[in-house]
Amino acid sequence: MASRIAKDVTELIGNTPLVYLNNVAEGCVGRVAAKLEMMEPCSSVKDRIGFSMISDAEQKGLIKPGESVLIEPTSGNTGVGLAFTAAAKGYKLIITMPASMSVERRIILLAFGVELVLTDPAKGMKGAIAKAEEILAKTPNGYMLQQFENPANPKIHYETTGPEIWKGTDGKIDGFVSGIGTGGTITGAGKYLKEQNPNVKLYGVEPIESAILSGGKPGPHKIQGIGAGFIPSVLEVDLIDEVVQVSSDESIDMARLLALKEGLLVGISSGAAAAAAIKLAKRPENAGKLFVAVFPSFGERYLSTVLFDATRKEAESMTFQA
């Protein structure tokens, strides 16, 4: 009998489960299932690209453990995906990140031995990218993975996420709903799904406050991980059938409801994906259709954010009962 023990943590990436949404989907004429990427080894969809970008660079002979210094700007979860892979493979990693990202993300990155550089939150991801490029210019053996431009990002979703969803739904998926950060998930998984069935519709989700894919202007919002304020080069915009806008408040409310009504503790971007998918599943023309929404990350990573403000205050003010 073959051993089922993984040779290292990177072999645990992928094959995340799908689950129907029930109680939050009242009034829907279509069905909504969630792809639970918080079940990855480090609790987010970015575990896939962290591994794929490092492995791809290794295969091309661009980096070597113990020699190369990996550098990446990230809003957090890609950093974590890179960090555990770098730790397992023996790389030094420098991460630049806007100071507005949750404290949990900082702690996790530091726990993996990352050198963390915080950047001006007012400058968003552009500020983090500029700082990473500055560090790269003065770092011997430095290598930037460039998640927003790296073809290894959508490639891993084409090779794994898309096939997993197709197989998991027995090919019965009608719509794929994904928040757009780098655009890697919707581009890679979406391309695979459309190759299997050209009638599958792809729905991108972006913050209403920073709706650049819809022709709006970039702006501040609270949905960490999506709505970077620019159109990434790995995003194939032409693949997308419709962009659905959701507000930060709507996303936060839905993330809270998912915990209370579905038993799913998820991050704000999962709330955004769920809110968008439910809107689509309520349209009369979508009766009987199956929508799969990507839930990118686990809620525990957001305990210090606005998502859990009221809960945190309640927990902190509690006293013991005699």
UniProtKB/Swiss-Prot annotation:
Enzyme nomenclature, EC number: 2.5.1.47
Residues bearing the modification N-acetylalanine: A2
GO biological process annotation, one example: cysteine biosynthetic process from serine
Annotated compartments: Cytoplasm
CC terms in the record's Gene Ontology section: cytoplasm
Residues where Phosphoserine is found: S178
Modified residues (N6-(pyridoxal phosphate)lysine): K46
Catalytic activity as recorded in UniProt: O-acetyl-L-serine + hydrogen sulfide = L-cysteine + acetate
Protein name: Cysteine synthase
